[in-house]
Amino acid sequence: MKVTEYYTVRHLLAATCSLACVALLAIGANAGLDLRAPEAAKTVFTQETGSAIQLALIIGNGNYPDAAEPLSQPINDASGLAYAMRRHGFDVDMVEDATKADMTRAVERLKSRIKPGSVVMLFFGGYGVQSRQETYMMPTDAVIWKEGDVRQEGMSVETVLHAIKERGARATLAVIDASRRNPYERRFRSFSHGLAPVSAPSNALIISSNTPGKVADDTKGQHSVLVTELLNNLNAHASAEGVFNKTRVAVFRASNGAQMPSVSSSLLEDVHLNPGDDPDLTTSSIAPITTENADDPSPTSPLGHPGHP
């Protein structure tokens, strides 16, 4: 073989080996990515993936100008429940000390995200007032001097629940912690204590902090008795109706019989607050907490703060 031919063959062999090495490195890199991808997918589902499946609007109102002093528990209750519901896969919008405009915007945000098949939770903590056998959630800027003001200034629980139903929600859950003795009760003769029975739309489950017409004064704890017992029972492997009924009994016992929450259900199927217990909620449709935020109890809402559209 000539010297020139020898060097040509040698160069070709070297080039071939180099290309083979590059190919092997590329295959190895892709294999590494493929191995990591499934694990990453377990912890980095986007919240958009589950936004139409489990939604919660949580409102905590504590600073009412007409009250002798602020309510400390509703905001603590809202923060604690928001954190717990995020841990259960809910996409949570929490608002604190909401005015009527804030509450209206929050409900509109919620309605815009509901799709057929959604499970939706509504929580309200603060002052509630009944008028004409209907319960109204009071915003912090409510000005109440006569019964007509309640309907004008407040937000009807039933109206919100029916709006959720009309958007195609699979099921609606409501926790109304508003049976407190409120600062408006002596301003008009026709005032009725406590909350009115809530007329639930179909496929809804509602728990109120006390029997209709009865008041429930706040305790000295960080959370109200209702929210304390609800948080204690959320991890039970039971349907939402089972959780609410367990909470009802626990509140009655914790208050030594002074407080008996009212539970109303028109559910047509089992709904579970633990995603793993619900066959209709697969891991691909749950909005989980990402790894970097899993230990952060911050109540910051991904949907914005009060006053933000």
Question: What do these predicted ranges mean?
Answer:
Residues 2-309:
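Cysteine endopeptidase catalytic domains of the caspase/legumain-like
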